Design a protein with these regions (language model features):
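A conserved helix-loop-beta module that forms one wall/lid of the active-site cleft
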Residues: 68-130
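Short beta->alpha connector loops
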Residues: 27, 49-51, 101-104, 165
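Short acidic-hydrophobic, aromatic-tinged amphipathic segments that line or gate anion-handling sites
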Residues: 21-27, 99-103, 134
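ATP-binding N-terminal substructure of ATP-dependent carboxylate-amine bond-forming enzymes
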Residues: 1-73
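Conserved ATP-binding module of the ATP-grasp superfamily
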Residues: 43, 86, 94-97, 117-120, ...
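Solvent-exposed alpha-helices and their adjacent loops that cap or buttress functional pockets
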Residues: 1, 14-16, 68, 90-92, ...
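Short, well-ordered alpha-helical microsegments
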Residues: 52-54, 107, 168-169
């Protein structure tokens, strides 16, 4: 099948060269659905994590709209570092040793038993910024305070894990 028209929500200067940018709030699933139906769009490819984590694939599929992207449950692998760690543990997938903490005090107490460096992560979408590699207790306490203080939104939990030396890789 041939592609006749390409839309990007919301798009940017780069996508404007190959597609029509559409200014739609990615949190407004109803408005997105209405635009898709009005324009008779055949396939939606969802890129950003937030709408995926919020369930846009599930929502659009209810209206028989073809969507390429994981459903809400599968998107939690990206949306919650703790969810992913629990999946790894439950299915014996090798991963760094970790602890889950719901408040600053418990997280800071854990530092007394930690070997540094350690990794501290906010358990929510943080645009790739919610990860700290901490060399000592002082920088760890600062990271914990920043995360629970709202730097990355309303993080109710944090993940503290052992630091694994090596090259970082992402696969898409």
């Amino acid at each position: 099948k041939k592609v006749n028209k390409l839309y990007c929500f919301p798009g940017n200067a780069g996508t404007a060269k190959i597609a029509k940018n559409v200014d739609i709030d990615l949190d407004n699933f109803k408005k997105i659905k209405n635009f898709i139906l009005k324009e008779k769009i055949d396939l939606i490819v969802v890129g950003p994590e937030k709408p995926l984590v919020n369930g846009i694939t599930d929502y659009l599929e209810k209206f028989k709209i073809k969507v390429f992207g994981p459903n809400k449950l599968a998107s939690q692998l990206e949306g919650s570092k703790i969810f992913t760690k629990k999946i790894c543990k439950n299915f014996n997938i090798p991963t760094a040793k970790f602890g889950i903490f719901t408040n600053e005090r418990k997280a800071q107490n854990f530092l007394d038993k930690s070997n540094f460096p350690i990794v501290i992560k906010a358990d929510n979408l943080a645009s790739g910024k919610g990860v700290y590699i901490c060399e000592n207790k002082k920088t760890s306490i600062e990271a914990i305070k920043e995360i629970f203080g709202g730097k990355f939104g309303n993080a109710k939990n944090i993940l503290i894990e052992e630091f694994l030396k090596g090259e970082e890789m992402s696969f898409f």
